[in-house]
């Protein structure tokens, strides 16, 4: 018979199969969620960086943003949306990121540094605009045309510029909806 005194051997604890199943179930669920999120972002979204200071203070130069490419398949852009587009559909250009301030059928004019849409002062541009560009004379937007301008209008090449002009809906990549950290700005949804 064996003495029940000191024993230098540890008893091995068995891990139950139920616990293993639970652990693998969690790992599989997390991995599947990450994979599904990646597929959604890759196929329905796009990632790009803001070029220049035209969208400050909302977005900073070099800030990474995510673009929803699917939204405008179901609906049209609205005033206030921040969109990414290729100017005049130029595939060789970087994406321009600007705010929609007017849509199809709207009348746009910049007078005395103020942006007017349909005769009303725009709530989207509060800074005095130094260069009216082509909007010095009233522009009536055509079907599926949008007037887009940077939140920092005096440091922005946008729809006021003759080489960009009103943006065609077909040239829009999608709506910017999320940004990553840049400088002091944290991650979050774009307003």
Please identify what each model-predicted range represents.
Residues 63, 78-82, 106, 145, ...:
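Structural motif
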Residues 135, 140-191:
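Beta-strand-rich cores of mature extracytoplasmic or soluble domains
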Residues 54-58, 71-76, 99, 105, ...:
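Short, surface-exposed secondary-structure edge patches
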Residues 49, 96, 109, 140, ...:
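Short aromatic/basic micro-patch
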Residues 95-120:
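Mid-length scaffold segments of soluble, non-membrane domains
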Residues 117-133:
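PP2C/PPM family metal-dependent serine/threonine protein phosphatase catalytic domain
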Residues 1-93, 167-191:
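Protein maturation boundaries and topogenic segments
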